[in-house]
């Protein structure tokens, strides 16, 4: 099962996340101040929580942030400001069979498409 995740940050409204499962968008907006990287991490955490809530197994989490994917997989250094997100992910790991987190191009990230649709002009 593929689960797409993406986070965004807007100066006026703050952070937002989107997760796409089975073609359905799960969007959270107004998540307060933070950075674009915080938003990407929150999107991954949202995706893992949602997979557990939906009872999904053998999931692959797909996001377009190389930094977050690398930090989550332990293949990239996690900056001090984001260690709390890595710890939150580790706490969620028992909810999932295994955490398979992979990078996908931005143009292929269905969650990114969902966020972009929110702000079409």
Locate the predicted segments by residue:
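RNase H-like nuclease fold core
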Residues: 1-38, 49-53
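RNase H catalytic domain
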Residues: 8-12, 45-116
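Short, conserved alpha-helix that lines the donor NDP-sugar binding/gating region
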Residues: 40, 44
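Acidic, His- and aromatic-enriched active-site or binding-groove loops in soluble protein domains
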Residues: 121
């Amino acid at each position: 099962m593929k689960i797409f995740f993406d986070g965004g940050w807007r100066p006026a409204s703050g952070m937002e996340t989107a997760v796409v499962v089975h073609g359905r968008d799960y969007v959270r907006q107004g998540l307060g101040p933070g950075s674009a990287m915080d938003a990407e991490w929150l999107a991954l955490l949202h995706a893992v929580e949602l997979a557990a809530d939906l009872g999904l197994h053998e999931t692959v989490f797909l996001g377009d942030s190389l930094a977050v994917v690398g930090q989550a997989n332990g293949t990239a250094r996690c900056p001090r400001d984001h260690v709390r997100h890595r710890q939150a992910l580790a706490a969620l790991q028992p909810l999932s069979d295994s955490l398979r987190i992979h990078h996908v191009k931005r143009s292929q990230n269905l969650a990114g498409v969902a966020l972009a649709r929110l702000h079409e002009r």
